[in-house]
Curated annotation (Swiss-Prot):
One of its GO terms (molecular function) is protein-glutamine N-methyltransferase activity. Its EC number is 2.1.1.297. HAMAP family: RF_methyltr_PrmC (MF_02126). Belongs to the protein N5-glutamine methyltransferase family. PrmC subfamily. SUPFAM superfamilies: S-adenosyl-L-methionine-dependent methyltransferases. S-adenosyl-L-methionine binds at G117, T118, G119, T120, G121, D140, W168, N183. The keyword Transferase applies. It comes from the Bacteria. PANTHER family: HEMK METHYLTRANSFERASE, MTRF1L RELEASE FACTOR GLUTAMINE METHYLTRANSFERASE. GO terms for biological process: methylation; translational termination. This is Release factor glutamine methyltransferase. Keywords: Methyltransferase, S-adenosyl-L-methionine, Transferase. It comes from Salmonella typhimurium (strain LT2 / SGSC1412 / ATCC 700720). It is an enzyme of class 2 (transferase).
Amino acid sequence: MDFQHWLHEAVNQLRDSDSPRRDAEILLEYVTGKGRTYIMAFGETPLTDVQQQQLADLLQRRKQGEPIAYLTGLREFWSLPLFVSPATLIPRPDTECLVEQALARLPVKTCRILDLGTGTGAIALALACERPDCEVTAVDRMPDAVALAIRNAEHLAIRNVRILQSCWFSALSGQQFDMIVSNPPYIDAQDPHLSEGDVRFEPRSALVADENGMADLTHIIDNARQMLTPGGFLLLEHGWQQGEAVRAVFRRSGYSDVETCRDYGGNERVTCGRFTP
């Protein structure tokens, strides 16, 4: 079987996927080591028996709903190729909105940034890449996530980031930052979307929070003040229906300049506030 015929068959088998053609192409690129342009130009290239078996196994797993990123171990975020694993969330395009808003608020001078619950390191590494003059600290409570974020930093040769194991602020006593960012768990445990799509395979501890999904958001907002320098910013990603509640917690905790920004789909996604003692 050649590239072209396998793609045709795979697209048909993945017809219930949101993106059957792209899914099939990614799997073929991953197994053959060939880029999309090569595959399109040389569709008559035969697959080896080993490649056909690998593709059959991956195709079956994808048909059962396993995310492409977990099948290949790779995901692009902010144009950075990242290693991913089932120990962490898969970086999503909407989270790039958090990076955009953070960059827009960073001062021109060198500053210190903290990323809470870093997972793959996506947010921290994007900020560190864009602002090599800044010192970025990234923390996660899960050892596997810390190891993965370190691997990504080393692979990308990003030097201005340090990655630590910490449950939110627990290992950061006495330290201060000019900006704190986070994409914490914010989904309610009873949300029916937890049984749909990619999230079925992602770690629930990185998705679900108590108090209707607000517990971790509230904890960060209430405790970030003591870690921020005067005038420093806190930016949080949250659910599309949580904007009003998150703004209320920011204001209750004494932050100024509180505002919510929308994601690429037009939904309220990132809320920020400024620490003004």
